[in-house]
Structure formats: C-alpha cells, structure tokens
C-alpha cells in the first residue's frame, strides 16, 4: 500500500519477525513512519494477517497515540480507495476504534478497570485530580507529624533534629520528595527498606570490596586518563624542544605511575599506590640555550597534575575502613527511621484516597503491576494468570520512545510480552534473569519473542521524571544486528530532516564530546547521523554559526557619549544576548524582498522567503530568560511569543485576585489588603491609606478601617476595638477631619467585603470567583488594559483551577487558598495562558524539552553560557535509584555535620548523570534544525577562556573526558571542540592567540565563529553631519528679520495641497470595506465608509445581550478553522470538537450554542466536505495583502492625478484547497438568505479579490469559487 521508498534499514525495522527487535532511530530518521508502516504490514499480511486489536502499541503521549491512529486510519482508507471491496481493510477500519494504541497509563488503567475485582478498590473509583492530591498529601503528612510528636517517637524526633533545620517543613519536603522518588520503583516499600539496610553493616564490613569503592576508583580513572594525556603531551614537547631533555626522566616516572594506576583492578592497591607516591623533583639545571617557553609550559602542566593527584590522595586518605564503618553504623537508625516514616506517610495517604474511592497517577502503574505479577516459591517475580492471558491476546507489543521508560513500565511490559525469564532482587536491585520459568500451564506457541522497541537513547531527556535510559542501553549493548537472532537490533541513523551542514556540524561536535562517561554512549562514526534529506542545488546551505560575547567587555564613557547612550543603557547579560539574537533575526528575515534567508517549504515544494514563524529560539530553561528576550525582540519590531511554564502567579491580575480571595477569607492581613485597596477594585490613593493608618499604628489595617466604619455609622465599639483606642477623642477628631469622600469609600468597601465573605460560604469556589470578576468589574478592566486578551485568559485559568478544585472532596475558600499557595511554591506554577495559534507569524521561544519531536527551519540555541542547574546536589539528603540514600552525617550532641562518605559518592554519581542528561538535551536542541543553526552564548573573560580551550586540544579526535566532566555550561563543551577546527583560525587570529595548534581538525563540517561586543549592540550612532545641519538651520532662522520671511509664512500657511482628496483615503482597506463601497447607493460617497466614531460603554459594563449576527459569524468561522473533517463522522464527533474549543478557551459555553453540529455535519457530508477530505493541500484562514490601483475602488478621483496611486487590500481567506487541475476557493457565510442572486452580487467583489490574491501568492489557477451558506445548508458557485 505504501508508495514510500524505504531504506534497507527501515525495511528491516518494518518486516523483521519472530524476535525481540530494538530499533535505534536517530533524530529525523522517520521512526513514527516506520512504526506505523510495521503495524500496517502486520494487519495486511497476506500469509499471517493480525487484527489491529491484537497489537499493543504504547506511546509516550496521548497526542502521539492519536496521530498514530490517524495515520493508520488514513493508510487503510487509501487502501479502500484502491480496493473498495476489501473485507480485510473494512474489518481493520472497524477494529481501529477499539485498537490498543495508547499511552502506558491508558493501558494500565484499562487493565485495572477490567480486573478491579482482584484488588481492594471500588469499581467506581476515579483518578485523583492533581489539586486534590496535593491537599491530601499535605493533610496526611501534617496528621502524621502531629501523631509522632504526640507520642514522642524517638527515631522521629532524632530525624527532625538532624534534618529539619529550624522548621519541620524541611523534613516534610524530604519525605514527600522521597515518597515521589520511591514510587518510580516497581516495589516502593521493598526499595525503601533495602536502601536503609545498606547502612546496616556488620563487623566483617570491608569498604574496599563494595560497589562504592569500585565507583570511586572508576571515577578517578577518568581523571587519570586526562593526566596521562597531559604528561604524554609534555614529554612530546620535551623531546622536540631545545635544551630541556633533562626533564625527560622525572616526567617518564610520573607517566609510568599513572599507567600503573590505570591497570589496577583492586581498590586497596589503587588507594595504596596513590597515597605512597611522591613526585620526583625536577632537576635545577640551567641551560642558556633552553627553550624557556616550552620549559615553562611543561612545568605548568606537571604542576596541574601534581595538584590534582594531591587532591585525590587527600580524598582516598579519608576512606579508612574503620572510620567508614562507624559512619554507616551511626547513620543506620536515622535512615531506617526515614524509610519507615515514608512508608507510614504512604499508608496514611492511601487511607485518605480509599475513603474517597480515589487513585492517583502513580497508583495507575503500581495497581496494574500488582495485577500482572505473582511470586513463585523461590520469591521470583513472574507473570500472573491475567498477564499470561494478555500474552495470548497480543501478537506483538510495540513500544515507542523506549528510551524514556522507567523500571515500573519495563516490568509491566515484560509481563504482557512473550519473554522468557523472571525478575528478582539482587543486592537490593531488581534484576531481570532471562531464564525459563515453570508455569502451571504450558505456553504453547507463546515462546516466540514479540517485543518491538523503538527510540533513541541520545534523546533520553526525562531522567528528572525517573526515566531510566539504562534500560535501552542494556539491550542496545546486548542485542545483535545479525539476522535470525531472538534479540536483534536495527539502526536507523539516516536523517531525513536536516541539511548536510547541520548534520555534519552535529556529528563533529558530538564525536568530540559525547562518551560513555558523559552521555552514556560513545558517539562514534557508527552512531553518527547520515544525510537523508535533499534540498537541491537552488539554494546552498550555510555554516553553523557560533556567536560569542565577552561579559567583561567594558565600554568607556567616551564610547557611551559617542553612541548617545545613557549609563542606564548598560545592559545585563541576558539583555545583551537577547539583543544579539534580535539582530541575527533581522538579518535572517531581511525585508522579505531581498537579503533574507530562503527556506524550502515542503508544502509548496519550493523555496520561499524566511518568515518569523520559521524561527525558534531554544533555551535550557525559559523562566528568567524568555521575558527579557521577548522585550528585546519586541523593541526591534520582531513579533515574538514565549511558551513558558512559569510566571503565572507573578502576573498583576492574578496577584490582585488572589489577594482579594485572601482578605475575603481573612481580612486581618495587611499586605494582601493593601494590594486590593490600591488596585482598581477599591481605588484608594496613597494619601488616603496614610490617613486610615493614622487611626492606630499598632493594629491591622483592616481594624483601622473597621473602627472608622463603626464610628462613622454611629455604631458602638465592642470591647475588642475599645481595647485598642487609647484616646477616643483623638480618634474621633481624626475621623471628623477626614473628608466625606474617603469615609464613604471606606464604608462602601467594608460593606462589600462583608457581603463577599458571606457569599463565599454559600456557593462553590468557581462560581464565587466568577461572581467577583463580574461584581468588581475586574475581568472587564483587565481586558481593557494592554495585553488585555492575555490577562483575561489568565483570569479564566484561575477560574478553571477553581472549577477543578470544586469537583474534589475539599471545599471552602481557605483550602483553595492553601492549594494555590502550595502550587506557587512547588512545581505547580504554570506559564501564562496560551492565546496564540500555531500559524501565527511570530518567532517562538521555548524550552529544549518542549521542542522534542518538533522541527524548525531555523533554530537559535541561546543561553549556552548559563551554568547547569546543580542545586539539587546541595540538599542534606540525596537519593539515587541504585545507590540509595546519601545523607549528611549529623551528630546533634556534638553539634557537627558534614557530608558522609556515601553522600559524596552519590553526589558525584548524580552529577555525572546530570551532565549526561545535559549532553543529550544539547543533542536534542541541535537536531531540531532543518536548514540553519545558530548558537549564542556569553563568556566570562574571553581571552582566558579561549586559552583554556586551546590547552585542551591535545587530542584532535576528542575533547578530554576530564574536561567534559568538569564542564559547567554548554560552551565549556562546544568551545574546546571548535577551537581546534579549521574554521576557527580567523577567530583565533581575531583574539590574537599566539599559541600554535598542532592538531587542527580538517573536518567537513562548516562553522562560522563570531565575536561580538557590547558596542555593536548599542543604539546606532547619531550622524555628526545631521547634528551640524540642524544647528546651522537654527542659527540661520534666528538671524532672519521679520520682513524677510513674513510673506513666505503667509504663502505657506495658505498653501492648498494638490492631492488633498487622497489625504482622506486610507492606504489599506479590508476586503469587507471594499465590498461595502461597491454596494453603496450611487448617491453616497466614499466618506460614508468611515463613520464618525461612537463611544460606547465597555462590554463588561453593559447589560448581558444576545449574541449578535456578527459575533455568530465570527464563532462559526473560528470553529470551521479548527474543524478536523477526518474526525467528523457523526454529530457526537462534532460536539467533541466543540467541547475541545471550549476547554482550550477559544470560545465560551454560551458562544458554543450558536454552532449547530447538525449543520456542520451536513457540510462535512456534502460535496465540498468530501472534496476537502480528498485534497492533500488544504489551507484555512490564510491572511493576505495585495496592491491594486486606487482608481479601481475610488472611481470619483481625478484619473490623471491619481493614475499611479496604489492601495493595499488585505483580508483573510476562509479556506482553499488544491485539486489536480487547480485551486478551489471557499468562503463561509452565515447571513440570512432571501435571494441567492442578491447574495452572489453582495459578495462577488470580495471573492474576486480573494481569487486575485491566491493567483498572485501561489501562482496557480483558481478553477472554482464557492460561497457556503449555513442558513440554507448549501453552496453557490461564483462565476
């Protein structure tokens, strides 16, 4: 069925059978297409066809599952077009709706629902909302701590004193974090107890024989390899330099010592030799012919090695067995208590969920696991009877994005796949043993392996979610590429996305820096990407650009004056980089007529000018950087949108509304109260607030207002308030002197607040918040501000959060505020509401994680000089899935605390894993680019940094591993790799680097390294001659006498402009304006198009009205823009699409009522709907601008004078699609129809300009033009 020309490797991935198949698919290798084609081939196999519901296809996201289902459906439908009578195809199309193409969580949920009777859960369970989960966890941990305090549990008290700092909230955070971490293990309780027992060492404990000792030795050996290279480099210099040969022997001894250490396999011997070694002294010979520069260079290198070896000696000297044993014995009670505390918390949390018949996100996987697993008599974990039934059901299990699997998911998939073996614990770790297991029933026909796993370990970037790339790597290293193996692998490294220039650059860089130590994979020629995309010869590719700027570049006062720039313009680092990027974008886009970059448009099949939407700016994290970049790009007139995950709670409108909720809950809070009083909700001035505070400075602000209110209303003060009034006469005088307006303002606010407090008790929180929006007018006010649409969208998100909260078992304003505060200070903060469509012509800023799976013509990777985030390493207890706990040693009696030995080991392990993750994140970022890649970054002290890079260039094939290990930024990796590239010569010369490189790399990759300074980014210099001319004109005018210019002034003031009529004609018109002009009565003139502006109340102040015909038309057009005809088979499908628009906040529920699913379905089933479905090129809501003669519209103008006058006509084409013999133009109309001819006449001119625009833009013929009339559910053709 497929017309795609597959590569040999892709064909192997599609057609290989009867084995466990691991497909390593590099970036842009078309893995989704291969996976889909494999499924299609399975279900259409002529010899052994498999029904699609007999396949289990596990995807990473719901979107991926939907896309895969859609692709398979399209393929089957195309097959039916070719063979309409095919029963097999019809059957598969029917079964597609109940196919098992889903995320791992959807599959687990399916298992639970089908087998709930085996668990102690109510069949009517529901999945716990995140909101409810947060509140329940907090409630559970608060109750647990209170109970343990009450019974004075000794282990708990010791834990609090050791690890809780001043408040026990820190220990609560440790428990919650460890609980979340343990849930990524298949059997959390077992893992927790095993990790604590790791500290329970006996008298025979020997540290030198432990895994920890081996890890220390292996980590140190990575550094020793670096020292070896440095010493070998020194020896080469000694042998090739004049007069320093007497250094040879001591350097040779040092090198022999390092080589001996590298050969050691025993930690005891390794430690002993390092501690015992003394570096021989260098001879003090003087030789006047000696090469002093070479001598100094080798001495510096040796000193560096000596210093590092001394550091290693000191570390190893502290690893004395008895000391370590005592440390473990001391820590054991605390670690056991911590594990037990987490288990107690989990049980309490579980009880709360069961009370409410809830399960949470983690429960889904663990409940499924418990259903699918059993233990045999040996204690091994084997498939349950239910799992064996799934093995019989599924002919193949296909797993997408396999590199992001965690251990729980791996065990689940192994239970339902036909794999031989069992899981068991060994040294506290869960290990898979590929051996036969005895099952009660023989598994006839189920002994043929049936797992298909596809992914790219170089793109495994979710370790923070406990993804375990080692699962993929273990199979990758174990499986064989040979045919007829039961465990086989196929490599798909041909990239069909990027230009050769991008691929060559990525390959060069990662061959230099990625290794098993950092990246967990050696990036060899075998692992490198291969060019698979063709971009033709019309436009040549460009080199990858690296744009660097020195943070310490100082600008003198003279330069600031020369460029007419304030000292306040001294930009911070992020602004500098943002401005640099803005200038690069301006150069790339050009003026869209010439000078800009040309990119290939796959849809058009040709090159076109680069647009803003083609550009993405990627960042490791967007929280602090994106807003600054947005500001800098906006200053340069570049449309930009930042897709961030933070900052929502910092927006003014949300802060104000949360403050209002806080004071409604409890008005005795000065900061939120003042926030509300200063806001438009209350509109108090600073002077008015000062007057209120003068009542009493020792009570809350609300109490001051309450006293004023009661005395002004002649109400008696109760004893509470009387207590705070020392001098009633003084208070009365203050209130008497207060102006009436302020007193009325206070009374009005107090009365409203009391009303709101009362109302909050009686209605749900979401209703109450919307009531406040309307009552205060704040929703409308926010919409009237700059970026009003964005602000209102943010307020709607708060309302939606409240709506979710209202569905939980928690009620009340107090709990909702607690929940919001919890979100603020956890990872629950989200970015501002998204109000931008996918097709908007803007530059996008997003995190690298969000870009995964996407591609862009131009990628700008920014912030490469920013330090990696290693803050987690500073916590007082670290956790590692394999090594367990890494606590500080805290002796409260002796008041000493320091990192324990095991903490230092785990800290280093986590640091290396974090660096490996960062390496893969960098790989993901660079492989998003199709045609152009730009990298930007700031460097602290350019000269010193580049000199350091040069010192790391001894091996032209690889940046030394020790250097990669010590990297703190992406530039620390990129710089040493590029400095030795042949394209860096001019860069080194620009920096006047005198050090000669013996290892210049002549690689085929193309790079352009630019050095920027702050001067280039300052405002453009004011031309001196312009200033001089201005001054001369001023002097001349001042010297003129009245008689010389009085007559000229009168002459100029009475001047009549020749083109006066043109001054009232707009330079731009919409198509709708043109249509109105043409249907005006002949007596009417052009000016009636532009009526006098009528001021009206803002919508939020007006009474609620019915939706107008104009609004109705807008809503229906919006729906048609987002309508997916492939998913519109019945009215229910259309209702689902309407609901999706409501959820995404494109329309409100009230607005959705104007959309008739019946009428939409009639369109979909009609001739035009079918033609759209059959077209491969459908475009919706396409904006355009075309230039036409002004006389074409304004016929009353003087033809001679205005013959060259032009107008811009702009509009938006609802829909056009392409068929074999031309384009079809379609415009939707919601007007009421009396006369078809009248409608045709009304819109004829509009359609004419749409046709002309399409002809000009696409260069293709418009063969048919239609109006679709929703009022009569039919279309008319425009001739």
Curated annotation (Swiss-Prot):
Q: Which HAMAP family match?
A: AddA
What is the organism of origin for this protein? Clostridium botulinum (strain Okra / Type B1)
One cellular component (GO) term of this entry: cytosol
What EC number(s) has UniProt assigned to this enzyme? 3.1.-.-, 5.6.2.4
Catalysed reaction(s)?
Answer: Couples ATP hydrolysis with the unwinding of duplex DNA by translocating in the 3'-5' direction; ATP + H2O = ADP + phosphate + H(+)
Biological processes per GO annotation: double-strand break repair via homologous recombination
Instruction: Name any cofactors this protein relies on.
Output: Mg(2+)
Origin: domain of life: Bacteria
Keywords from UniProt, A to Z, are: ATP-binding, DNA damage, DNA repair, DNA-binding, Exonuclease, Helicase, Hydrolase, Isomerase, Nuclease, Nucleotide-binding
The record's annotation in Pfam families points to: PDDEXK_1, UvrD-helicase, UvrD_C
**What is this protein identified as?**
ATP-dependent helicase/nuclease subunit A
Q: Give any GO molecular function from the UniProt entry.
A: 3'-5' exonuclease activity
Stated family: Belongs to the helicase family. AddA subfamily.
| Protein's gene | addA
The record's annotation in InterPro entries points to: AddA, DNA_helicase_UvrD-like_C, DNA_helicase_UvrD/REP, P-loop_NTPase, PDDEXK-like_dom_sf, PDDEXK_AddAB-type, Restrct_endonuc-II-like, UvrD-like_ATP-bd
Q: Which PANTHER family would you find in this protein's record?
A: ATP-DEPENDENT HELICASE_NUCLEASE SUBUNIT A, UVRD / RECB / PCRA DNA HELICASE FAMILY MEMBER
What the protein does comes down to: The heterodimer acts as both an ATP-dependent DNA helicase and an ATP-dependent, dual-direction single-stranded exonuclease. Recognizes the chi site generating a DNA molecule suitable for the initiation of homologous recombination. The AddA nuclease domain is required for chi fragment generation; this subunit has the helicase and 3' -> 5' nuclease activities.
The residues listed in the UniProt record as binding ATP, with positions renumbered to this chain, are 25-32
Query: UvrD-like helicase ATP-binding domain spans which residues?
Result: 4-499
Pinpoint the UvrD-like helicase C-terminal domain residues: 526-853
Oligomeric form and interacting partners: Heterodimer of AddA and AddB/RexB.
């Amino acid at each position: 069925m497929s017309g795609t020309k597959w590569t040999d490797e892709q064909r192997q991935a599609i057609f290989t059978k009867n084995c466990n198949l691991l497909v390593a698919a590099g970036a842009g290798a078309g893995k989704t297409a291969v996976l889909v084609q494999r499924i299609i081939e399975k279900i259409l196999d002529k010899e052994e066809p498999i029904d699609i519901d007999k396949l289990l296809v596990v995807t990473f996201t719901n979107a991926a599952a939907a896309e895969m289902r859609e692709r398979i459906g399209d393929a089957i439908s195309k097959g039916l077009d070719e063979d309409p009578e095919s029963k097999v195809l019809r059957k598969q199309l029917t079964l597609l709706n109940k196919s098992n193409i889903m995320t791992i969580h959807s599959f687990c949920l399916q298992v639970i629902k089908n087998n709930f009777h085996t668990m102690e859960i109510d069949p009517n369970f529901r999945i716990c909302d995140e909101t409810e989960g947060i509140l329940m966890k907090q409630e559970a941990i608060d109750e647990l701590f209170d109970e343990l305090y009450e019974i004075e549990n000794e282990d708990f008290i010791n834990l609090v004193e050791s690890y809780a700092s001043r408040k026990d909230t820190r220990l609560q955070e440790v428990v919650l974090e460890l609980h979340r971490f343990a849930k990524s293990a298949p059997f959390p309780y077992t893992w927790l107890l095993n990790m604590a027992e790791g500290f329970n060492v006996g008298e025979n404990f020997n540290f030198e024989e432990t895994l920890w000792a081996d890890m220390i030795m292996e980590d140190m050996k990575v550094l020793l390899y670096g020292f070896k290279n440095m010493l070998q480099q020194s020896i080469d210099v000694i042998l090739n330099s004049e007069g320093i040969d007497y250094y040879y022997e001591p350097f040779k001894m040092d090198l022999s010592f390092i080589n001996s250490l590298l050969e050691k396999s025993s930690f005891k011997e390794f430690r002993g030799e390092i501690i015992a070694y003394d570096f021989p002294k260098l001879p003090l010979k003087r030789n006047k012919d000696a090469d002093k520069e070479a001598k100094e260079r080798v001495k510096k290198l040796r000193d560096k090695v000596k210093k590092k070896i001394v550091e290693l000696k000191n570390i190893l000297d502290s690893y004395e067995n008895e000391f370590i044993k005592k440390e473990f014995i001391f820590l054991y009670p605390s670690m056991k208590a911590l594990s037990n505390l987490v288990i107690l918390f989990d049980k309490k949390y579980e009880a709360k969920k069961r009370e409410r018949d809830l399960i949470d996100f983690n429960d889904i996987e663990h409940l499924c696991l418990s259903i699918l697993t059993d233990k045999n008599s040996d204690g091994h974990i084997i498939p349950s009877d239910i799992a064996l039934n799934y093995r019989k059901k599924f002919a193949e299990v296909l797993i997408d994005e396999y590199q992001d699997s965690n251990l729980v998911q791996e065990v689940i998939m192994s239970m339902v796949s036909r794999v031989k073996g069992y899981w068991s614990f060994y040294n506290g770790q869960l290990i898979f043993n590929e051996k036969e297991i005895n099952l009660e029933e023989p598994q006839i026909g189920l002994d043929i392996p049936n797992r298909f796993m596809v992914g790219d370990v170089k793109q495994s970037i979710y370790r923070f979610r406990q993804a375990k790339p080692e699962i993929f790597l273990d199979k990758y290293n174990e499986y064989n590429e040979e045919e007829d193996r039961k465990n086989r692998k196929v490599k798909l490294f041909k990239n069909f996305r990027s230009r050769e220039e991008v691929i060559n650059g990525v390959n060069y860089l990662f061959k230099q820096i990625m290794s098993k130590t950092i990246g967990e994979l050696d990036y060899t020629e075998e692992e490198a990407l291969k060019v698979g995309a063709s971009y033709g010869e019309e436009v040549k590719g460009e080199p990858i650009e690296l744009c660097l700027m020195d943070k310490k570049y100082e600008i003198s006062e003279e330069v600031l004056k020369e460029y007419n720039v304030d000292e306040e313009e001294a930009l911070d680092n992020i602004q500098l980089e943002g401005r640099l990027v803005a200038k690069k974008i301006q150069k790339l886009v050009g003026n869209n007529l010439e000078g800009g970059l040309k990119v290939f448009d796959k849809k058009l099949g040709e090159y076109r000018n680069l647009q803003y939407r083609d550009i993405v700016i990627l960042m490791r994290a967007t929280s602090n950087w994106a807003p600054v970049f947005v500001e800098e790009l906006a200053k340069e007139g570049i449309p930009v949108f930042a897709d961030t995950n933070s900052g929502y709670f910092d927006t003014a409108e949300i802060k104000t509304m949360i403050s209002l909720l806080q004071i409604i809950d409890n008005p005795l809070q000065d900061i939120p109260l003042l926030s509300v009083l200063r806001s438009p909700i209350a509109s108090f001035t600073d002077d008015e607030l000062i007057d209120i505070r003068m009542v009493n400075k020792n009570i809350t602000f609300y109490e001051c207002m309450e006293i004023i209110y009661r005395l002004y209303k002649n109400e008696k003060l109760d004893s509470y308030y009387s207590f705070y009034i020392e001098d009633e006469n003084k208070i009365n005088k203050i209130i008497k002197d207060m102006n009436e307006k302020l007193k009325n303002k206070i009374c009005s606010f107090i009365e409203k607040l009391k009303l709101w407090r009362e109302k909050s008790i009686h209605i749900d929180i979401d209703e109450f918040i919307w009531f406040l929006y309307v009552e205060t007018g704040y929703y409308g006010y926010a919409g009237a501000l700059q970026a009003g649409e964005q602000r209102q969208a943010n307020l709607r998100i708060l309302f939606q959060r409240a709506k979710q909260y209202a569905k939980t078992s928690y009620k009340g304003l107090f709990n909702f505020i607690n929940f919001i505060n919890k979100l603020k200070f956890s990872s629950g903060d989200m970015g501002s509401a998204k109000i931008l469509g996918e097709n908007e012509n803007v530059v996008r800023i997003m995190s690298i994680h969000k870009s995964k799976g996407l591609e862009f013509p131009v990628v700008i990777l920014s912030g490469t000089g920013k330090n990696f985030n290693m803050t987690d390493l500073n916590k007082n207890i670290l956790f590692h899935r394999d090594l367990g706990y890494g606590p500080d040693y805290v002796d409260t009696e002796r008041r000493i605390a320091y990192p324990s030995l095991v903490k230092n080991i785990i800290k280093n392990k986590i640091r290396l894993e974090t660096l490996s993750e960062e390496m893969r994140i960098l790989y993901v970022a660079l492989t998003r680019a199709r045609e152009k890649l730009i990298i930007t970054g700031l460097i602290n002290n350019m000269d010193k940094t580049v000199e350091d890079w040069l010192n790391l260039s001894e091996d032209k094939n690889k940046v030394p591993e020790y250097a990669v290990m010590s990297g703190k930024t992406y530039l620390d990796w990129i710089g040493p790799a590029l400095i030795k590239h042949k394209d860096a010569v001019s860069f080194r010369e620009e920096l006047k680097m005198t050090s000669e490189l013996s290892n210049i790399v002549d690689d085929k990759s193309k790079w352009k390294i630019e050095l920027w300074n702050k001067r280039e980014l300052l405002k453009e210099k004011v031309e001196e001659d312009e200033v001089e001319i201005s001054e001369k004109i001023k002097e001349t005018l001042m010297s003129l006498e009245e008689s010389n210019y009085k007559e000229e002034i009168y002459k100029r003031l009475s001047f009549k402009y020749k083109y006066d009529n043109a001054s009232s004609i707009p330079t731009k018109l919409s198509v709708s304006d043109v249509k109105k002009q043409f249907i005006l009565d002949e007596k009417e003139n052009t000016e009636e198009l532009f009526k006098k502006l009528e001021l009206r109340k803002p919508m939020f102040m007006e009474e609620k009205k019915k939706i107008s015909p104009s609004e109705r038309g807008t809503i229906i057009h919006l729906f048609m823009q987002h309508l997916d005809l492939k998913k519109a088979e019945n009215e229910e499908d259309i209702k689902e699409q309407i609901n999706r628009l409501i959820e995404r906040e494109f329309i409100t529920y009230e607005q959705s009522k104007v959309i008739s699913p019946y009428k939409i379905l009639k369109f979909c089933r009609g001739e035009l709907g079918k033609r759209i479905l059959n077209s491969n090129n459908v475009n919706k809501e396409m904006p355009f601008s075309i230039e036409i003669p002004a006389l074409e519209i304004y016929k009353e103008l003087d033809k001679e004078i205005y013959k060259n006058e032009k107008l811009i006509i702009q509009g938006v084409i609802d829909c056009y699609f392409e068929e074999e013999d031309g384009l079809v133009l379609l415009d939707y109309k919601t007007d009421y129809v009396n006369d078809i001819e009248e409608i045709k006449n009304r819109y004829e001119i509009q359609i004419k300009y749409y046709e002309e625009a399409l002809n000009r833009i696409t260069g293709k013929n418009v063969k048919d033009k239609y109006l679709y009339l929703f009022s009569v559910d039919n279309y008319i053709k425009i001739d």
